[in-house]
Amino acid sequence: MRVKTSAEWNGERDALLDGLRGFARIMKRRPFDNEQGLRGVSAFALYWFVRRTAPSVVFEVGVWRGFSTWLIEQAAPAAEVHCFDPLFMLQHLIPKRRIGKTYRSPRAQYSSQDFSCAPIRELVAGRADALAFFDDHQNKIPRLLQCKASGIKHVVFDDNMSETYTHRTLEHERAADAPLLEREIEAYETFPALWPVDFRSGGLHLKEAGIGFPVERELRDIHRDRNWHSYVTYVRLK
């Protein structure tokens, strides 16, 4: 398993900054301000990984209000998109004010099935560029193995932090059983903080030095949400 280093991320600094400026322009068209889930640099991280992979089909697991669906469509405008969330079965029972504004795409296929129960292999249909994105707060080793069984090699995980959280992350697994990940993963890239992060919530404390990006006028909205850092991680399976 090849883990991308801070030095390697710094080596891509010019490309990252250029991509971030383009992303800031795209964000002016966002359907709503995301108050939960992907925000700031973490939203850019998903956009960056999806755009770089250029998948023909994307599986989004954990949709909620749909902000990440919109991000995926901006990064891969020609991709087929399949969205999975039990919310779709329950949404009519939840007052709209509890959810807020939502984005539902006419391009996407929506399902209340769990990813593990859906016919993913048939939907992948041998496409080597298929990508899955998980923001579902479920343990990640089962998700990784489900992707492998379905023929998906490109996987992006949100909330891949080493601190105690709502689920077992890949960082937890790296600390506990690194050989398991070594057997399954070819490349492992956790998107860096672009600016300093110092975030506390209950017993959780996230602190990152960042890599010193400038705070340009067009980047201020993204910089404002810099503390919503969720360690978005791209994995390429063997």
Feature locations, PLM:
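S-adenosylmethionine/decaboxylated-SAM
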Residues: A43, Y47-K238
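Class I SAM-dependent methyltransferase Rossmann-like catalytic core
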Residues: E12-T53, W70
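N-terminal auxiliary segments of SAM/dcSAM-dependent transferases
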Residues: M1-G11
